[in-house]
Amino acid sequence: MEKIKQFFKELYIYQKEMYPIISRLILGMIVFAEIYFIVLINMGAGMSGMNITFPVDEMSLDGALWNGVKLFPLGIEELVCGFTIFSFLFWLRIADDFKDREIDKRLFSHRPLPSGRVTEKTLKIFISTLIAITLFLNLTFMPNFIFCVILYTYGSLMAVWFFQKHKIAKSLPLALITHNPVQLIMNIYIISFVVIKFKPFVNPFSIYSILAVFTLYFPALIWEVTRKIRAPKDETEYVTYSKLFGYRKSTTFAMVVTWIDIITNFILVWNLNKVSVAILAVLVSWMTWKFLEFKKEPTKFKLVDKVERYTYLQESTMILTVVVYLLVGKI
């Protein structure tokens, strides 16, 4: 009994400090919903109650039909898909702690794992159980189980440095190239579900499906780079992009990727809400100003703080675009 109490005590400590369950579960659902709906509504979908609707010309199509539309009820599949995003990101968080435990003992000794307040055994038992539950739910309810397997296979390779730790761990750019694509694979997992469930209404090779693959990928890339850009006086033994390439070049790279990202956003919302396009234009202009300001005076603020604020506002705009479209239609 005492061991069980200790187990849950350690889990509580870990989730509170490293991965708050409630907020991250909501985030997982939001990530799923943004990609799910942005693809569907660009393909002509609407909503009727708790059903996704597509207009049909031929009444011979399989599935429920009502007033000239085909109905696809929302249900357990959508919940499982959102939960999978939450679960997978939780696993990556723990896997990162395992991978970085030696350097964390020096640089982040206050964290739950390096401080000894949480043991590896507890986290291994928990994450093994969580992965098993997630795979079972996908096998039972999801039509795209193979894409779940691909996602978790890639995550497993990340956890062991793709069996090339001696090379990747010492190279920040190589780590970025091998690890950052996981966001693309996560997006493909969601989109594959949309394509399979709503066949033949969703074309996997449409411009909207392809661009949706990069939704949240570019923001994740920008954040990953900018959190490792520092002013020269703030550098430590921790390897950063600013230490490798200089803070000006690293900032320019992040700024270019930000503009590539916003162009994909413009295309995805152009036919849905012109007000959203204007808001996104204002946001990217502000972020560009902050990039240029940081290049001029890197000690004025932490660049990643501005990027996080921009990303929250950007993604909130994308989500509100979906909500407004579903409620009132095109603007």
Q: Which residues make up each language-model segment?
A:
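Multi-pass alpha-helical membrane architecture of UbiA-family
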Residues: 1-331
